[in-house]
């Protein structure tokens, strides 16, 4: 430092974030906040956050958490408490996902944390991952942050927003490691038929890809459609299936999600070691929220009232469609 001259050190963001975008929160939301300050009325459809819109969790879930708070003050196993993982394992069985043990279940502070964990454990710089377009932005953001190259495949509006199978096939290269599906889809709402899922499973089988299946909306299916978990159709393909309680039980703020490993786990031993390492580094997901999983999955499913004719979600969906 020369006499009379002061050099001030400044800090910028990491270059790792240069190409990372997350529009659920970020510049778009900042601009919406500015517009609100200017007096404009903003309808916020950027995030699935039920509570501010008047949706509440089933009372028994709230009471169950309150009754478990005192015994939930310590860390749990990195994968989660036994009762939560047991309930999730049984849920997987009901969904037809074969060969799942309690050790294949990981709880997380929402599915978002687990998606980020999976991308960090899998991708080396330049590895490719197939992600639907349009997508839920977290998938692209976390894969990019992990050093991966995101390759978007088309979900065609003219074909009920189903994945374009030929487009998927055309975009696979020797560096492709995995394919992501979001089913039911966010943001399109499409529920994929079994035939589409089987074709995606065939592609993953042929090219030895991991399937990541984001199924957080699996219990919000209307009009007689049936949700099928792709892992139930691909017992020989390594699958990671994500779900949680944020949407179905209206408790996004509690931050409780999970992932289920199934299929050809013997082909992913090194990857699973990486998942275990990163899971251990964050110690555990929040224990009070874990304590309600058993009650939430086994008890009264209030979401069913909302998605039947006359229910709020059903009627609002129809109203918006008519507009």
What are these regions (language model features)?
Residues 38, 146, 206-207, 237:
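Helix C-cap/helix->beta junction micro-motif
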Residues 9-13, 18-110, 117, 284, ...:
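N-terminal small-domain helix-loop-helix segment of the aminotransferase-like
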